[in-house]
């Protein structure tokens, strides 16, 4: 989540001389006030009774009998080595590069620290603190607070601990068949292959062939709205060791964050919901949180990647496919309500994939909580723009347009003295043209 070029405190995260209006109609003028309002926006995503929730978590884990477990020097070293280098620092003013310079003796001390925190369940407060940097969203009004997204920076030592624990958690969670996120030998590519294969298989049926309806569901700020007590209850039902259950429960409750904006720093506030922003363990915890998503009924499928959920149905008559899909959408909505996730029908989309040109302009009649889901012809799912006939023309054209624009930048660089260096051009190509095609 971090990007050094974006998150250096010395570099501006927006124009310093503009007033910013926030959702509470508060217009922030000073840098200090902007930092304060940003922190409220990023930390207080959902309002819950934090103290009551924390007491529930304590009660849930208090009776657990923990079996001792030891983290080894090799596990600590491998966790550090396999972390991508970042220059941005956490709230402890450390980054992963600092840890990569540790020698054997220092690694031993660090491992002892991790083991002490795990065995005693005493977690340093700095491990539960997030430093948040507001980053302007592209092509958005910089005068609105909602036009900024948070980059959350954590202690690299805390993230090392998270990384050490991940294998112990994932190996004890039953994998969900249709979940492609954060799963061995699965990725966005396998998710997209599963979805597009369903569509093309339908097209290849004997006439009149199968149409496929795909709904792309929008979960608003899904990672940030997770109910922590509900998450711990789901963790309790797994085969994860009690020692790790107790540690994770303590680690994710009572977390705090502060925001830095243009050199101004807000006060710390407590996160009331959500898995740790910027944490490497968070995707695994979210996968656990959504593991009890209702299974699709017969004639309906679903493909998920983290919080991207795409239920679908195929049939020679699109109206029958639509009727098959509607009850499942209602089941998913009820599940999101129970789990306190926010399903937004207005930002969700429904698309009819059909081999028949006459049906390209069909408006579907699917709803979530009695709200019509917008019908779109070219949805963007997991970075891939699809079209009703699955020709990928829209995706290819948009990718080519973006690549052409970046190639012009390369040509301009090649005309400068310093830009003629081969390595400079290759690095720029990978960062612009190649990355835009992945």
Residue map of PLM features:
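Basic/polar low-complexity segments
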Residues: 1-73
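Short, conserved secondary-structure transition motifs
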Residues: 6-12, 188, 254-258, 351-360
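Conserved pre-catalytic core of RNA-dependent polymerases
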Residues: 42, 68-276
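Short, conserved micro-motifs composed of acidic
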Residues: 66, 263-264, 327, 342-377
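Catalytic palm active-site di-aspartate
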Residues: 90, 129-132, 149, 179, ...
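Catalytic palm subdomain of template-directed nucleic-acid polymerases
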Residues: 100, 219-238, 310-333, 391
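Active-site palm subdomain of RNA-directed nucleic acid polymerases
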Residues: 165-180, 204-207, 283-313
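Basic, alpha-helical interaction scaffolds
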Residues: 298, 371-438
